[in-house]
Amino acid sequence: MNHERERRVRIRYLRVGAAVLLLVLMVAGVVFAAYGCGNSGDEDNVTADAEVTIPPTEALTELTESEVQEPVVPFVVYPHRSESSAELDKKYSGKNGVLINAETGEIVAGRNEDKQCYPASLTKVMTLIVAVENIKDLSDTVEITYDMLAPMIAVDASLAGFAEGEKPTLEQLLYGMVLESGAEAALAAACYVAGSETSFVEMMNEKAEQMGLTKTHFTNVVGLHDKNHYSTAAEMAAILSYAMQNDTCRKLLSAVEYKVPPTKKNPEGLTFASTLFGRMYGDEMPGVKVLGGKTGYTDEADNCIETFAEVNGTTYILVLCGCNTRWDAIYDTLSVYSVCCAGGKDYEPPEK
């Protein structure tokens, strides 16, 4: 009887031991499988799977947002005075003006450069920047509508010449906006990018904020007068400097002429001529080469001009606002580069 009891106890212990051993083996198998899965294949595949299957945590969301919102400004030149900065000679026209070294931002000469003024069509340089940075394909087309033309005609704004119903490419619109200062072209590009002028203007102001511009505010994409549409000569120089760093913007601002092929609405096609290079060649002064820029005018702003030029291997930016006439703006631009950058003389207009 005792032997029978001992035999049963041994069997019970054997069963318990077998169960424990089986459980240990099962746990070990799970651990091994998990370890094997974690190390089979390369790490890139695991990471890729994780990005697809793991929902973002708060930290990951913040990282993603910071990457998306990282400023696209590679380098913003902020005009600043130094001990060598001079006052712009009073003989040069313009209520506000600044000449800067485009590479360092150092002000060579200035006058009321931080004082608020109206930018007129110099506005379109910021319009150009925002458009180019948000357009993926310049061959996309935009239909010119009555609503794009009528308001601009009503205020006698400059037009590129597109007709209602035409479908120019974005490239054609941007050339029309820069070279001819075409208001309808600016409005069409803005509507393509943002759906409306109002939304696009918000993007312009956001861009100004990104660039650290504290004295610039826009209310329209064209440069029409509005008391809340303003900038400074210094901040307009910063905007032009930014545009110059974008190859597309620089190409547009440096263009002399651009031709649009004939259409049913414009059977002879369109030829856009630069309002800047239509008044100067750019190489009138020894050692100075004006490379590009933009002009503007409203009754309230008077004549405005901003240019970039190369002198002895250095690039400079000059902004003059509030000039008496368009020719004063041109002649003084040539003179300032010559005198202040090349050590030359003032420009002497040819006798009529």
Model-derived features with residue positions:
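Short, flexible coil/linker elements and helix-boundary hinge sites characteristic
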Residues: 36, 178, 342-346
